[in-house]
């Protein structure tokens, strides 16, 4: 694996952090400011769908309205007052300071208001000249109202707020309409703003007030007292969310919002920084697979010049990701790992501002506070030995992910083993079929996604993988999940050898291997349930079934034919030569095989069964097929299939006939591999529930 591509012909990559400046912008928004705070439930319910929506931007703010003098001394009229909406003070000292900013100015205006009220005490109360004190500010979506519509002249000194309007229960509708029309005529409000306030008033007034006022009651002192009662906020005991009975003071203001890369989703950022319109071959990145702290993407050739930018965008938008890798080639290694490049890595300090990065407390192994097991320490010590360079050892630790799946913990050396998070549902489905007392033989186990949860469930496990790193980390994961040593056995051998030794000894009771002999002698390791065999290597798993093929009944072959026959016998001889000491009644003929394969045929079910039969050497009768399942889509025309079956009666008859002392030698059953499933016999069909949820691609 390489940390960077070595193709000299590739275009120079953009600087990863440069995209942040390109997406930085400011936006001026219209905002609705109101008092009292008790009206929040009702107002926010009415404004639902009308508020500004942007990632990491609060659309409802707590503000303190502070009136300040515009600089024209000697005047206390409202036209000479500018209202600033500040953040609430963090402590009492700041609160006192902000409340004293314009104490003298506020006293002058209050005296003028009281004098005006005395001269005309019989008229309905007028709204205040400006808001003051604690308020709520709601940022409006530009499609509802733009700041430029409120204040066409951006240099206007009075661009701070509009007149205050009194809305809600107890306020005559005619009076509200009159005030809004006056504001329209004087240019204080645009039509869209007036319509919004009219809608707010009608919705707020729809709640039945404690008293109804009409124009005829304006001169009634008792009605004036009732109006003041309506305008007063309800007591906390009578307050209900979404309902408010009383008057609300409302005005409009502007708010400048700065937008950075933190305010956009990953798809939005990629559409902004990648020239998707200019380059027809450059398509939007659909997503990525996350394994622990590692994000895995499959970039096309058109994406490669922007690989570092794509990696940085993924890091910026996903705090749990600290490394981004790109798959370079298809899986071709016998160990099933794939070549990858690191296109993004979260540093311990941000390169731009020096701030500690999000993943600064994540170690190179991708852990956050988890203690290492003894087995894992041994593996790390081995990797840090002279066999590996320091850079390679660090790379291996950095690409070892900590994954939790279905209640189990896994260490996954992602660059050295095969792991597919999209198979999570399939792991749970198959393990869900097993019961305590069952025995699982996992022929291609990887790091144990089938084996570990099965063992944790009380299933005795024999897990094998040809990849020595996978076998090492299976032991790590067994210790990490505190599995008993006598219930979890790890092997590192070829799959055919595992089938011909460990599985054969267990099914027939031959117990030829020392490990199996020791295990079966333990009372807790006897199979009291069912044996399961999983072969989860869909590209070639069916080919391993050739160990069960019958021997050729041709007695004499010549030249090259004899050589080829000898090779075939070496593969499948074990399952065609039953030892004399084996008791036929002790053979478990109910062992259930779960074999995975790929299919692109129109009839997926029939094709999956044909693949099994062609490599097994026997036709599967309907009673031998328990389930044929489509696991997931791999490509538009390619599916991953699972055939669950038992070995057919013809196989067992052939095996028993091969035991010394029986009449006749091993024979080939009449049902050859060319035969299809009997007419009208259909296997059980069940489509995985996860099929609709899993994305395409390996």
From Swiss-Prot:
Reactions this protein catalyses: guanosine(37) in tRNA + S-adenosyl-L-methionine = N(1)-methylguanosine(37) in tRNA + S-adenosyl-L-homocysteine + H(+)
Report the subcellular localization: Mitochondrion matrix; Nucleus; Cytoplasm
A GO molecular-function descriptor: tRNA (guanine(37)-N1)-methyltransferase activity
Assembly and binders: Monomer.
Q: Which Gene3D superfamilies match?
A: Met-10+ protein-like domains (3.30.300.110), Vaccinia Virus protein VP39 (3.40.50.150)
Naturally occurring in which organism (per UniProt): Leishmania braziliensis
Keyword tRNA processing present in the record's keywords: the answer is yes
Task: Name the EC number(s).
Answer: 2.1.1.228
Q: What is this protein called?
A: tRNA (guanine(37)-N(1))-methyltransferase
**Binding residues for S-adenosyl-L-methionine, per the UniProt record?**
427, 465-466, 494-495, 536
Role according to the record: Specifically methylates the N1 position of guanosine-37 in various cytoplasmic and mitochondrial tRNAs. Methylation is not dependent on the nature of the nucleoside 5' of the target nucleoside. This is the first step in the biosynthesis of wybutosine (yW), a modified base adjacent to the anticodon of tRNAs and required for accurate decoding.
The organism's lineage? Answer: Eukaryota, Discoba, Euglenozoa, Kinetoplastea, Metakinetoplastina
Biological process according to GO: tRNA N1-guanine methylation
Q: What class of enzyme is it?
A: transferase
Q: Where are the transmembrane segments?
A: none
